[in-house]
Amino acid sequence: MISYKKAISLIKKNSITLPSKKISIEKALYKVCAKNILSPSKYPSFNNSAFDGFALSSRETKGLNSKKTKKFRILKTIAAGDNPKINTYKKNSTVEIMTGALLPEQFDTILPVEKVKYFPSKKNPKYIILDKKLKKFEYVRFGGEDYKPGNIVLKKGEQVQANHLIALAALGIKEILVKKVPKIIFFGTGNEIIDYRKKNIPLWKVRNSNNLYFSAFGKDLNLEIVDGGVIKDNEPYKLKKALQKTMRSDIDLFVTSGAISAG
């Protein structure tokens, strides 16, 4: 019998390199990435609002306080996905802006909606009233905060998870290179093994739990598992035949349980 350490060494020494193929990201969940995936662009691709509120120019709020207030005329409402272009901009103007909407070039800060004072009323707002100075870039989410061009989105050898897919889709990456899913056949061995579904079994027998466990464990790792059944100890020819058949098939790995000692 060889040691566990020696067994691992032999497995690594005789391991094979599985081929790679390009697939759509819709089919990539739990597959193993075959090469580093880099961001082709920055994300977000533009500066946008991190809050619902009003976009303003911080320069125009300079010197404001409770005794010195200013009205800002509401020009329009910009929701996420709207064209933010302002055809005619006048000093001391503002736009209502929703979370994720592109920040127009005339503005550089956001006043959250919870802090807004409307004029003449909230039901009929024409202006907002401000009584304090706003800092530049408050509540602004910058383009490239999540990813910059060339950043690693998915590493080689990493298993693709749901959080990777949302990033890949957001960056417009449609396909990635992944490793072929290993196909493994498993055989239980031993004269004592019988079907686990049998209700009453002889005292000297044991129910087959290994095949079910290996199949479930393999599927949990996104491996393709083939249940080869059970081969008796006194049927070595069947084991040999199964091994020969496997070598002629598309099976990548042949696994058996049992036979850990001289017996």
Q: For the regions a protein language model found, what residue spans apply to each?
A:
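N-terminal intrinsically disordered, low-complexity, charge/repeat-rich segments that act as generic
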Residues: M1-N14, I201, F214-G218, L253
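A glycine-rich phosphate-binding loop feature that marks nucleotide/adenosyl-phosphate handling sites
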Residues: I25-L29, I184, N234-E235
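Short glycine/threonine-rich loop/turn motifs
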Residues: N191, N211-G263
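Short, glycine/charged-enriched hinge/interface segments at domain edges or termini
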Residues: A55-D227
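Generic structural signal for well-ordered, non-membrane alpha-helical segments
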Residues: M1-I8, K21, I25, N47, ...
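A generic alpha-helix structural signal
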Residues: I8-K12, L29, L75, V113, ...
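Short, low-complexity N-terminal leaders and the immediately following helix N-cap/first helix
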Residues: M1-K68, D108, K123
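Hydrophobic alpha-helical scaffolding
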Residues: M1, L18, V140, W204-N208, ...
